[in-house]
C-alpha cells in the first residue's frame, strides 16, 4: 500500500454544511481522510470533527477537533471533547489556510496520533486522546465550502515488513525480533536487481521527536561510491543531496521549494530512478530531482540508511 490520494473511496461531492456523515469503515492506522474545499471571504472559522456518534444532546464525544480560525493572524486549534468537556487546546499558529483560497486537508490516522497535511505540506500532529477505533462519524461545521470528502482505508501502514520485494539485508542482526515495530539502524541491504531507469526504492519511517538529521544512501557496493546521498537536516531544515565518488564528496545541492520533514512525523520517501536523474517524493508530493553524477547505474546495488528515525519498511521494485 502506497500513500496515494488518487484511489480514494466513498467520495462525497459538494456536501451541504453543516455535514454529519457516517465513516464507512474503521479508522485503522494508515487510513487517510481527504477533504478538498474553499474558504469563503467572510469566514471566521470552520471545523472538522472526528466523532464517536452524532448525538446532539448529550453532545457526542469528539476524538479530534480540527478548527482553523481566521481572526487576526489566524491559527488552528485542536482539541478533544469527552463527556461534553473540552480538554487542553493545542494551537498551531503557522496556518496554511487563507480566506478566498482553496485547500486540501489530508488527515492520516497513525497508531498513536493523527498527522495532518494541508496543500501537500505537513501541518501538525495530534496525539490520540480517544482510541481511533471509537470514531465512526465525520462532522464539518462553520463557514466553509467543501467540494469533496474521500477516504483511503488501509491497515498495513506502520506494520513492519523488514525487507520485502527485491531486497536482501546485508547485516542479518538488523531483522527485528517479532513484536519489534522497526528495523535496526544502521540499515544496509543489497538490491536484488540493481538500479536502472524505472527502478524504485521506497523508505517508510517515522522521524524521531528530537531528530537532527538522517540519511538514505544508494551505493555501488564494489567501489563504495555513493551515487545518491539524501540527507534531510531537521535542525536547519535543509534537504542536502550529494555524491561521494572516487573518495571525495562533490558539491552539495540544497534548493527545495519546501522542506518536507518534521519531528515526529510518519513519512514515505519514494526514490525513482530515471534515465538522467533520480526523482524523490515525500508523502506523495514531489520534492526534488538529482542529476546522475555516477553514470554506471547498473552498479548501484546497495541501500544504506541511518540517523534519527524509526525505520519501518524498505522496499524496492
Curated annotation (Swiss-Prot):
A beta-D-galactoside binds at residues 249-255. One of its GO terms (molecular function) is integrin binding. Ubiquitous. Selective expression by prostate carcinomas versus normal prostate and benign prostatic hypertrophy. Its main location: cytoplasm. Disulfide bonds: none annotated. The record marks 59 as: Critical for binding to sialylated and sulfated oligosaccharides. Keywords: Autophagy, Cytoplasm, Cytoplasmic vesicle, Lectin, Repeat. Signal peptide: none annotated. One of its GO terms (cellular component) is membrane. One of its GO terms (biological process) is xenophagy. It is found in: Cytoplasmic vesicle; Cytoplasm, Cytosol. Residues 19-152, 187-317 form the Galectin domain. A carbohydrate binds at residues 69, 79, 89. Contains two homologous but distinct carbohydrate-binding domains. Beta-galactoside-binding lectin that acts as a sensor of membrane damage caused by infection and restricts the proliferation of infecting pathogens by targeting them for autophagy. Detects membrane rupture by binding beta-galactoside ligands located on the lumenal side of the endosome membrane; these ligands becoming exposed to the cytoplasm following rupture. Restricts infection by initiating autophagy via interaction with CALCOCO2/NDP52. Required to restrict infection of bacterial invasion such as S.typhimurium. Also required to restrict infection of Picornaviridae viruses. Homodimer. Interacts with CALCOCO2/NDP52. Interacts with PDPN; the interaction is glycosylation-dependent; may participate in connection of the lymphatic endothelium to the surrounding extracellular matrix. This is Galectin-8.
Amino acid at each position: 500500500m502506497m500513500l496515494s490520494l488518487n484511489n480514494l473511496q466513498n467520495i462525497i461531492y459538494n456536501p451541504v454544511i453543516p455535514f454529519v456523515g457516517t465513516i464507512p469503515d474503521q479508522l485503522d492506522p494508515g487510513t487517510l481522510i481527504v477533504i478538498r474545499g474553499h474558504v469563503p471571504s467572510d469566514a471566521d472559522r470552520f471545523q472538522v470533527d472526528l466523532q464517536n456518534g452524532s448525538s446532539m444532546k448529550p453532545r457526542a464525544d469528539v476524538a479530534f477537533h480540527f478548527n482553523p480560525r481566521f481572526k487576526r493572524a489566524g491559527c488552528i486549534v485542536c482539541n478533544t471533547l469527552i463527556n461534553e468537556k473540552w480538554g487542553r487546546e493545542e494551537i498551531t499558529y503557522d496556518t496554511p489556510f487563507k480566506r478566498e483560497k482553496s485547500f486540501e486537508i489530508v488527515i492520516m490516522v497513525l497508531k498513536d496520533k493523527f498527522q495532518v497535511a494541508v496543500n501537500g505540506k505537513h501541518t501538525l500532529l495530534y496525539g490520540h486522546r480517544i482510541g481511533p477505533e471509537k470514531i465512526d462519524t465525520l462532522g464539518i461545521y462553520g463557514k466553509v465550502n467543501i467540494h469533496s470528502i474521500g477516504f483511503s482505508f488501509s491497515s498495513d501502514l506502520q506494520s513492519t515488513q523488514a525487507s520485502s520485494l527485491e531486497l536482501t539485508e546485508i547485516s542479518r542482526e538488523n531483522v527485528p525480533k517479532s513484536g519489534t515495530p522497526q528495523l535496526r539502524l544502521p540499515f544496509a541491504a543489497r538490491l536484488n536487481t540493481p538500479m536502472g531507469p524505472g527502478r524504485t526504492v521506497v523508505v517508510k519511517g517515522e522521524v524521531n521527536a528530537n531528530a537532527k538529521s538522517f540519511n538514505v544512501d544508494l551505493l555501488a557496493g564494489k567501489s563504495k561510491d555513493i551515487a545518491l546521498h539524501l540527507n534531510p537536516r531537521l535542525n536547519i531544515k535543509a534537504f542536502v543531496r550529494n555524491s561521494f565518488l572516487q573518495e571525495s564528496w562533490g558539491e552539495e545541492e540544497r534548493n527545495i521549494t519546501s522542506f518536507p520533514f518534521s519531528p515526529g512525523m510518519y513519512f514515505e520517501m519514494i526514490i525513482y530512478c530515471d534515465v538522467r536523474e533520480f526523482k524523490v517524493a515525500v508523502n506523495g508530493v514531489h520534492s526534488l530531482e538529482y542529476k546522475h553524477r555516477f553514470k554506471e547505474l547498473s552498479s548501484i546495488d546497495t541501500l544504506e540508511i541511518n540517523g534519527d528515525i524509526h525505520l519501518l519498511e524498505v522496499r524496492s521494485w
